[in-house]
């Protein structure tokens, strides 16, 4: 009230109301033990709103009334995950689960069973909540695991997410990871009301949760019945990790973070199997969709020892429920061509609803599968959503097969570019050999070429790529570097500023590195790690392009299949011409230096926190060029952890495991002393 002091009695009442509302939220969402009816809760909330409106100087960011009110966003800002938000590996039967347990015990050299934590696998949207001194400062989606989207404004509208952690025993900085869900009851009610208004409905609760969280206007998200459950800690600063994962979940409850009540600590894999059988029988009684169980090693020390492999932890697995199945008819079998030339048969089906999703197309995986299952046009088939996600054809019902059911043959020519289709002996996949020249492979090739780990062309997204191809502005990947401002501004929703920004990003991408360029080419089986291996070995692109299969096979980590793929790619005339044209258009990179023998060679490094002089990717590239290996997670196999500003939980894990810690200055000295920097 413009300089008028707030009466002490009013200030006290406001603080009391906030405390009561937060306590009732805690009892409702965390304890599932509400003590007042909704009408009384609403009265308390409205009283607080009125007082804060009258005395706006009393409003704080963590007040329960401040969940909604921000202006709509124009775009979601990207968020880099200090610790990658990795997905889990899946198993679909008891054999797979026992193999997971066996791998762990062999790695740890243990014969006896040990503790696991079992929990329902929620079918929602992964979310990261970052709290500083107990206050929610950021919420981000998983994205690709490394970069997500900032959805803080929308997340603040979810009533089960505390804006301020309870108590005072929380760390200086903590990242709480979990899942955003839309309960079945809320989903059904939302769709009923949407139908009445003539608005779009959602196919299933997961799509509804995802769509609600990614609304640019938080006022829309606020109207959606979303709930959050925590299940993991990411970053942690100012507090030591507890002994076990179940202790982390107790922290969450104490701080006011909802945790699923069906979580159970079990002894050995037999306990996991019992838990799975119990949840199979009771899953429909749960208020939200689940699609399996998640099994985690309970000991955090053992988790750190096991570490990660590829994009998943070794210490956790998802055991999926059997997929739901329905019958329908195959109307046609068509062919799709992927980025690496794989020609995949796809069944076009009479639309059928499976697990709440309308399915009209289903993968047949490859021609070996097609013939093994003996699926024909006209067949009545069983369709299921594999892992409750990807639709696939299980097989035909032979008793219903019509006399004119048509068997499909492998095409001899690509249905798009008419290049030869080959199916090597012993391989299940048939492939178009057209490479970068194939128009069907063009769209995915361009998206891959422009991706963050490749040439990193900011602003060249999926929709824009589609538009450029549709308007015939890009006929192959070299077309990216021949785009004109006048042609771009002539397109819908592309003004001068947008065109200038895109052209600037394209120009910037011309200066790259050999590993990035090799990865960008999309050679089958050549990921960013293999690309770095090839660049370190050959140093020059010309030498790599001329290498024989035998020479390639001599390189560590390059097997016979990868060697054949690399050799075949560079010996396709179209591919060689496109590479030369890209170089002629200005794509260039510094010559790769030979790996110098140093303290870095043969060592495994992990980075945590922000470096002042280098980006994370630049630091990783320099480590690789020096013969070292850069990984994203700390394990007992890590040699050094490079500690930057505001280090995360990797720092704490490294200390616990006794791993050598070096700061940025020491790391730079290592590089400079060997002429790498």
UniProtKB/Swiss-Prot annotation:
InterPro entries: BRCT_dom, BRCT_dom_sf, DisA/LigA_HHH, DNA_ligase, DNA_ligase_AS, DNA_ligase_CS, DNAligase_adenylation, DNAligase_N. Its EC number is 6.5.1.2. The active site is at residue 121. Its cofactor is Mg(2+); Mn(2+). It catalyses: NAD(+) + (deoxyribonucleotide)n-3'-hydroxyl + 5'-phospho-(deoxyribonucleotide)m = (deoxyribonucleotide)n+m + AMP + beta-nicotinamide D-nucleotide. DNA ligase that catalyzes the formation of phosphodiester linkages between 5'-phosphoryl and 3'-hydroxyl groups in double-stranded DNA using NAD as a coenzyme and as the energy source for the reaction. It is essential for DNA replication and repair of damaged DNA. This is DNA ligase. The lineage of its organism: Bacteria, Pseudomonadati, Pseudomonadota, Gammaproteobacteria, Legionellales.
């Amino acid at each position: 009230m413009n300089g008028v002091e707030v009466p002490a009695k009013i200030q006290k009442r406001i603080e009391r109301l906030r405390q009561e509302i937060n306590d009732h939220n805690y009892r409702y969402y965390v304890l599932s033990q509400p003590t007042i009816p909704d009408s009384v809760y609403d009265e308390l909330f409205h009283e607080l709103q009125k007082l804060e409106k009258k005395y706006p100087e009393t409003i704080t960011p963590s007040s329960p009334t401040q969940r909604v009110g921000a202006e709509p966003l124009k775009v979601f800002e990207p968020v880099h995950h200090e610790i990658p938000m990795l997905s889990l590996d899946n198993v679909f039967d008891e054999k797979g689960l026992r193999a997971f347990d066996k791998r762990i015990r062999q790695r740890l050299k243990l014969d006896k069973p040990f503790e696991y934590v079992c929990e329902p696998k929620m079918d929602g949207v992964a979310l990261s909540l970052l709290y500083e001194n107990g206050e929610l400062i950021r919420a981000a989606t998983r994205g690709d695991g490394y970069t997500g989207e900032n959805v803080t404004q929308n997340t603040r509208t979810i009533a089960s997410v505390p804006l301020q952690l309870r108590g005072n025993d929380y760390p200086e900085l903590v990242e709480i990871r979990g899942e955003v869900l839309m309960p079945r009851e809320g989903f059904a009610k939302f769709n009923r009301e949407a139908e009445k208004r003539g608005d779009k409905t959602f196919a299933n609760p997961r799509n509804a949760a995802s769509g609600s969280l990614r609304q640019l206007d938080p006022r829309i998200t606020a109207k959606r019945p979303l709930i959050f459950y925590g299940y993991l800690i990411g970053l942690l600063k100012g507090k030591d990790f507890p002994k076990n994962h179940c202790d982390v979940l107790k922290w969450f409850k104490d701080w006011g973070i909802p945790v699923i009540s069906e979580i159970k600590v079990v002894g050995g894999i037999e306990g996991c199997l019992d838990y799975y059988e119990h949840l199979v029988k009771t899953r429909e009684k749960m208020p939200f969709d689940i699609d399996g169980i998640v099994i985690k090693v309970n000991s955090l020390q053992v988790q750190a020892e096991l570490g990660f492999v590829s994009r998943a932890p070794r210490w956790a697995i998802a055991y999926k429920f059997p997929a739901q199945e329905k019958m329908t008819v195959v109307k046609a079998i068509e062919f799709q061509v992927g980025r690496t030339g794989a020609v995949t048969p796809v069944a076009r089906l009479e639309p059928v609803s499976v697990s709440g999703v309308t399915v009209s197309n289903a993968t047949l995986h490859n021609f070996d599968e097609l013939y093994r299952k003996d699926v024909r046009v006209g067949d009545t088939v069983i369709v299921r959503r594999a892992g409750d996600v990807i639709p696939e054809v299980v097989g035909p019902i032979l008793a219903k097969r019509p006399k004119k059911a048509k068997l499909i043959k492998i095409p001899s020519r690509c249905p798009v570019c008419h290049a030869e289709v080959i199916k090597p002996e012993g391989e299940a996949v048939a492939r178009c050999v057209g490479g970068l020249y194939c128009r069907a492979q063009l769209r995915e090739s361009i998206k891959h070429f422009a991706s963050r780990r490749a040439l990193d062309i900011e602003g060249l997204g999926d929709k824009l790529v589609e538009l450029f191809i549709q308007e015939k502005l890009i006929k192959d990947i070299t077309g990216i570097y021949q785009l004109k401002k006048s042609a771009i501004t002539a397109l819908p929703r592309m003004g001068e500023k947008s065109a200038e920004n895109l052209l600037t990003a394209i120009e910037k991408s011309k200066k790259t590195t050999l590993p990035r360029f090799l990865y960008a080419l999309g050679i089958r089986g050549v990921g960013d790690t293999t690309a770095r291996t090839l660049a370190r070995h050959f140093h020059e692109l010309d030498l790599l392009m001329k290498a024989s299969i035998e020479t390639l096979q001599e390189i560590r980590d390059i097997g016979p299949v990868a060697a054949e793929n690399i050799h075949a790619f560079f010996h396709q005339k179209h591919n060689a011409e496109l590479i030369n044209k890209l170089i002629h258009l200005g794509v260039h990179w510094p010559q790769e230096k030979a790996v110098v023998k140093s303290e870095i060679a043969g060592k495994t490094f992990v980075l945590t926190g922000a470096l002042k002089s280098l980006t994370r990717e630049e630091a990783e590239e320099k480590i690789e060029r020096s013969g070292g290996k850069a990984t994203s997670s700390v394990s007992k196999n890590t040699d050094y952890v490079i500690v930057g500003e505001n280090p995360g939980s990797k720092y704490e894990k490294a200390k616990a495991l006794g791993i050598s810690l070096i700061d940025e200055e020491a790391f730079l000295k290592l590089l400079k002393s060997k002429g790498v920097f």
